[in-house]
Amino acid sequence: MRKTKIVCTIGPASESEEMLEKLMNAGMNVARLNFSHGSHEEHKARIDTIRKVAKRLNKTIGLLLDTKGPEIRTHNMKDGLIVLEKGKEVIVSMNEVEGTPEKFSVTYENLINDVNIGSYILLDDGLVELQVKEINKDKGEVKCDILNTGELKNKKGVNLPGVKVNLPGITDKDADDIRFGIKENVDFIAASFVRRPSDVLDIRQILEEEKAEITIFPKIENQEGIDNIEEILEVSDGLMVARGDMGVEIPPESVPMVQKDLIRKCNKLGKPVITATQMLDSMQRNPRATRAEASDVANAIYDGTDAVMLSGETAAGQYPEEAVKTMRNIAVSAEAAQDYKKLLSDRTKLVETSLVNAIGVSVAHTALNLNVKAIVAATESGSTARTISKYRPHSDIIAVTPSEKTARQCAIVWGVNPVVKEGRKTTDALLNNAVATAVETGRVSNGDLIIITAGVPTGEKGTTNMMKIHLVGDEIAKGQGVGRGSVVGHAIVADSASDLEGKDLSDKVIITNSVDETLVPYVEKAIGLITEENGITSPSAIIGLEKGIPTVVGVEQATKEIKNDMLVTLDASQGKVFEGYANVL
């Protein structure tokens, strides 16, 4: 199973049902909606299509809303384009004007208060660089030297590297977009241009007011955000390393080390991290990635990222499906080369000690030492699965949760395969349900060794405190099956009706010699029936058929060989009984 998750930006090139199906089958785990572009109506249509296709394919796909953020842009230029020439001067005005080679304006009127003489102003992702020469606050104008020649079009981005900018945490548009996302039940918010913890708290306040359970991933895109990363992470659920604007705001040569540091900090806290921007940029135009791009994706995985993201490659590129397949193949190859024993050792040293982490690290070490097939995490909130994931075990992590929201939010967590299954109230029922669900995924089968981890008592969030090593059971008896289907339950041996009186039979398989009239009312309440009585026309077989209860008859010594409270799998189609949960699907 591929462990690194893939986030795909959905746009004109990928919004059709046909292409979304291809992306999901190719490996997309999370769909990103970029609210810098498009109306609510357009995004609503995309959300509906994504959910329709995901449901048809029975795939868990998370939805990520990426805010436009409090960015600075230029206003419009005369004829849509001007040329700024190196060596000349240009005025940046705080008052809106039609841009010319001599003067243009920006959307942020307080820029004049934030910059100083000598500050740099970068235009259009740094393609044109200006240096502040004079500041005239009376006129609201900043005179700059043009350091290199370049074109400037309408509404291009403006960056102020090294300048503390007093922009609001979120704009009115962001707030409207977030409320739209709440209404549409999105799973993640990627908050653009986060500089300080208060920016995240502004979003969290809206979520709390609306009682929305949406995880927040601040996008670190500037030096101020990097400087405040510890405090930002304290109030965040994850992080996006957005290298596009970051590479403009800080020197490009600093980006790789900043990326490693940000990912490491997230790994230490067990918070998911997405590495984004220009990962396979050339695949917008070409069907094959460059060698440098392949190395970039692989190195992000070696750094410890949970997810890698495609932007223009899937939103507007010519080869969206090929881009996802390429990213998937790079991830699988990179993961195969990992030294998971060393990785676990490094993570054990990195992560702080706590009760929950103690269970997590024990699970990971046990999984490695016993070479278990899978780790099955029964989880309400996703906390158990994230706790295991932070130690990067080689074994598959199967997160069994009753919450569709939790499942989608686990879709971005490294190594976690989320499955939605109705919750169980007792510990035994929870464990049985977890094993049964793991088998249903096809990743666990008869005879496999697995680890089950959960929090008990059940139903309480954030209480991971239990680990169980479990061997998926073997065949213990054989007879003649009646009906079809299979059930898993605890055996209850009955010589007569009195043995069943007053018992809860809702998860029980009745084991008896034969069925008479006194037993029928109890058989109706059970989930399965095993009898020593032989024959397809026997009373036991007839009752099983009439009541639609999976039944196996003609099992010799059933009442002696099968013990009370033993967990058994009854497979009516094959006439077999297994101890524990067996793969009979």
Swiss-Prot record:
The keyword Transmembrane helix does not apply. Its cofactor is Mg(2+); K(+). It holds the Pfam family PK_C. It catalyses: pyruvate + ATP = phosphoenolpyruvate + ADP + H(+). Keywords: ATP-binding, Glycolysis, Kinase, Magnesium, Metal-binding, Nucleotide-binding, Potassium, Pyruvate, Transferase. Its EC number is 2.7.1.40. K(+) binds at N34, S36, D66, T67. Mg(2+) binds at E221, D245. It is an enzyme of class 2 (transferase). Pathway: Carbohydrate degradation; glycolysis; pyruvate from D-glyceraldehyde 3-phosphate: step 5/5. GO terms for molecular function: ATP binding; kinase activity; magnesium ion binding; potassium ion binding; pyruvate kinase activity. The keyword Transferase applies. Substrate binds at R32, G244, D245, T277. Belongs to the pyruvate kinase family. This is Pyruvate kinase. It comes from Staphylococcus epidermidis (strain ATCC 35984 / DSM 28319 / BCRC 17069 / CCUG 31568 / BM 3577 / RP62A).
